[in-house]
Regions:
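Aromatic- and Gly/Pro-enriched helix-to-coil junctions and flexible linker segments
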Residues: 94-101
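Flexible gly/pro/ser-rich segments immediately N-terminal to CXXCH heme-c attachment motifs
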Residues: 25, 49-52
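Classic N-terminal secretory signal peptides
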Residues: 1-18
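Sequence/structural segment immediately N-terminal to covalent heme-attachment motifs in c-type
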Residues: 19-36
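Short microdomains enriched in Cys/His and/or Lys/Arg
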Residues: 51-62
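Axial heme c-ligation environment in periplasmic c-type cytochrome domains
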Residues: 32, 40-50, 66-93
Length: 101
């Protein structure tokens, strides 16, 4: 049931045409806290994209996802995400999708 809710959330967040990056974000649990266009526990992908617009932020955001932390968007900390949870290639693709939101 939990998996069904996560998949349904991802489809709502990204539309029916979810690609590999969106699938990786769903499997890694990103969609439990984030959505494309509204704040949940974590900030909306569109807000993250707006904050880093015009910057070469892929490596910076990949590090933030890996290490976790707080302070970038407020006091709620982001949990660290290991390579076992989302591999480097999927993480890079996911961050690129987020920055295009």
């Amino acid at each position: 049931m939990k998996a069904l809710l996560i998949v349904a959330s991802a489809l709502l967040a990204f539309g029916a045409q979810a690609g590999p990056a969106e699938d990786a974000m769903t499997k890694a649990g990103c969609m439990a806290c984030h959505a494309k266009d509204k704040k949940l526990v974590g900030h909306a992908f569109k807000d993250i994209a707006a904050k880093y617009k015009g910057q070469d932020a892929v490596a910076k955001l990949m590090e933030k996802v890996r290490k976790g932390g707080s302070g970038s968007f407020g006091p709620i900390p982001m949990s660290p995400n290991s390579v076992e949870k989302i591999n480097d290639a999927d993480l890079k693709a996911a961050v690129e999708v987020i920055l295009k939101s």
